[in-house]
Amino acid sequence: MDGFRIIIAEKADAGRRIAYFLSGGQVKSHRAKGTSYLEFEYNGSKTYLIPLSGHIVEADFESGYSDWNKIDLSDLIDARIVKNIKNKVAYQTLQAFRGKVEEIVIATDYDREGELIGVEALDIIKEGKEEIRRAKFSALTKNEILDSFKNLIGVNYSLADAADARESIDLIWGSVLTRFFSVTTGRLGKSFLSAGRVQTPTLAIVVDREREIQSFRPERYWTISITFDKDGQFKARYPENIKDQDTAEKIYEAIKGKNGRVSSYTSKEDHIRRPAPFSTTEFLREASRIGIMPTKAMSIAENLYMRGLISYPRTDNTVYPRSINLKSVLKKLENTAYSKYVKEIETFDRILPSRGRIETTDHPPIYPVDSPKEQLKGDYGRVYDLILRHFLSTLYRDGKKTVAEAEIYVNGYTFKAAGQHTTDRGWTEIYGYDPKDVYLPELTEGEDLKAIDWNIQREETKPPPRYDMSSLLKKMEELNLGTKSTRHDIIGKLIERGFIEGNPVKPTPLGMAFIDAVRSVNSHIADPEMTAKLEEDMDRIEKNEMSKNDVVEESKKMLHEVLSHFLTKTADVKDIITKGINAGQEIGDCPFHEGKKIMVIRDRFTYTVRCEDPSCKINFRIKRNGSITLSDQKCPVCGLPMIKIIRKGQSPEIKCIDPDCSYNRENEDYGECPADHGRLVLRQSKYGKRFLGCSNYPKCTVTYPLPQMGRITKTGEVCPYCGAPILALSRNGRKWKFCPNMQCEYNKKRKPEAAVEKSVRKKGRNASKS
């Protein structure tokens, strides 16, 4: 095997596309030591491509530091970090080629993480005599791949060092802070209390805004407006908010019933500027505006990249490099839903795309590189559509509008009116953005205007809005919290760990208490400046301005100082967080204890619904895979209030707040178990999937997966083939019966049930993994 080439790819899908393009489709697949690799000829040389699945090794502390209760946290900060094998199969495959290779080409993603993965592979496979090169590409297309292998570059070890430093720093900070808060509050095991150097200041942003809202005191003010009529109605407003009621009424009485005279009028043509090309942050912000959460949007974008449909989705760049052949890209987009605009852009004498403020050389902005051969479904189609229409908008023409302003004199007071009229929608026609026109007719100075309505309105100042996903991502970028590749994950972790919820984003009582505890000891880890300084240092590693070891050591000194503050006030931290954990969200009055409230307490995996009075029988847990509100219905059995549990894709579940009420048992009971005559009860798995399980579990392990979408009701019938209860499914205006035993002959003999079976197999296969 002497004299051959090895190519290291980051993922299997990317590896297959690279091998296909380099070989012209002539690829052999091999499997050895539990992993697959590809063989082909390239440039007259035998070539093997080894696809990895992310990191081969991972950073951890050396052995002896695993006991959370016994290890001194100061010692943990300075513990030696080792690299343990994470992917044994990939490690053994690379080892098998060690010393037998003439050339190694790293073809992982060209960013910090990708470079570190490539360097990890090099450390395993190289002996020192091999030629080591790097393929840099930004899209998994034929032209990009072939061009990158014709123009191989050197490995960027500084890029890998920056990623390695981040991995070490995040390990140290995350482990020390998480252990401190978890041990201090007694939240161990699955309920551990997570903390980190980036997620803590990000949580603080959300908490600070909530505190602003809570402490906000509205102030009254008055506004005055006049409606005029000239070829249509328009409004002019008094230019100030008037804080004094007497002054407002004085002005109103002076202008009421009076006409106006134009004292000035200006009109000008203006542009509706095209958006800048997509950076990662702006893409995620726009995706959140169409209802796709950042973590999901990034996952979909990575999938589209692997399929060769879009460029690399992790980038700060907002300027298309000259190397992109825009006309060639447009040619591939001619058969999309926007073909009309594609063909129009192709007729431009020169295509001059918009430009953003940030220009980098690692990757271009996100743009479509090909059109899908088959229609993309669901959110995949929506994300691709967003990227496509955004790209076309950056190439199209600016919109145009006429902007007008007028000052109108009314009995000693000046009122102002403004209007705009879109004369050319331009790019907004593609993007689906509809500029709002405000009517203001053409006026001349000295012209008399007829007033038809005079209005005085009392208003109140409003609190600042909560952050939504879009504005939170923007704020993180402004404060240099995280990177383009990590911000969506940080938000996702805060949601998963019960610190924040909803969109707009609201902190949970636990999130509020956590930040209060952090700030009670003056530790500064909630301040963005500390983590932003470390982000800047990691940028300096990439630029060869600092060494990896210097940055890691500096971060350790910071953490020692932070820890010393916490250790002096352990009891205070415990008290604040414990109160936050027990606070919960109030959803209504308790019917059994006057003056007490029913609370919903959110844990990492469950909701606890309980009364403030610890002796009350209202105390039960529900798996945390939906939202809980107090229903306006009363229980038909006992008359007590009911709660509504809303899970995505399922009809709301209504429960009586009395856990012993027969209403709950009757509505969860779907019939007799055919195996042991127990009751088949509706359950929710830890993954949020609904299924039927026998009430005699664990003695009886019978379970039936259920369709995850639609409303399921009892029919009272029993299956003549297997004895299970026959159920009815209502969905999309249709209703049909089915047996929950999806292999049953009943379903095979009834045509509509084929659709049910397919739905269950696809969406309910994990339902019984409780």
Curated annotation (Swiss-Prot):
InterPro entries: Topo_IA (IPR000380), Topo_IA_2 (IPR003601), Topo_IA_AS (IPR023406), Topo_IA_cen (IPR013497), Topo_IA_cen_sub1 (IPR013824), Topo_IA_cen_sub2 (IPR013825), Topo_IA_cen_sub3 (IPR013826), Topo_IA_core_domain (IPR023405). Residues 156-563 form the Topo IA-type catalytic domain. This is DNA topoisomerase 1. Its cofactor is Mg(2+). It comes from Thermoplasma acidophilum (strain ATCC 25905 / DSM 1728 / JCM 9062 / NBRC 15155 / AMRC-C165). Belongs to the type IA topoisomerase family. It catalyses: ATP-independent breakage of single-stranded DNA, followed by passage and rejoining. Mg(2+) binds at E10, D109. Keywords: DNA-binding, Isomerase, Magnesium, Metal-binding, Repeat, Topoisomerase, Zinc, Zinc-finger. The keyword Zinc-finger applies. The active site is at Y312 (o-(5'-phospho-dna)-tyrosine intermediate). GO terms for cellular component: chromosome. It holds the Pfam family Zn_ribbon_Top1. The gene is topA. Releases the supercoiling and torsional tension of DNA, which is introduced during the DNA replication and transcription, by transiently cleaving and rejoining one strand of the DNA duplex. Introduces a single-strand break via transesterification at a target site in duplex DNA. The scissile phosphodiester is attacked by the catalytic tyrosine of the enzyme, resulting in the formation of a DNA-(5'-phosphotyrosyl)-enzyme intermediate and the expulsion of a 3'-OH DNA strand. The free DNA strand then undergoes passage around the unbroken strand, thus removing DNA supercoils. Its EC number is 5.6.2.1. It comes from the Archaea. Residues 4-140 form the Toprim domain. The record marks H55, R166, D170, R314, R497 as: Interaction with DNA.
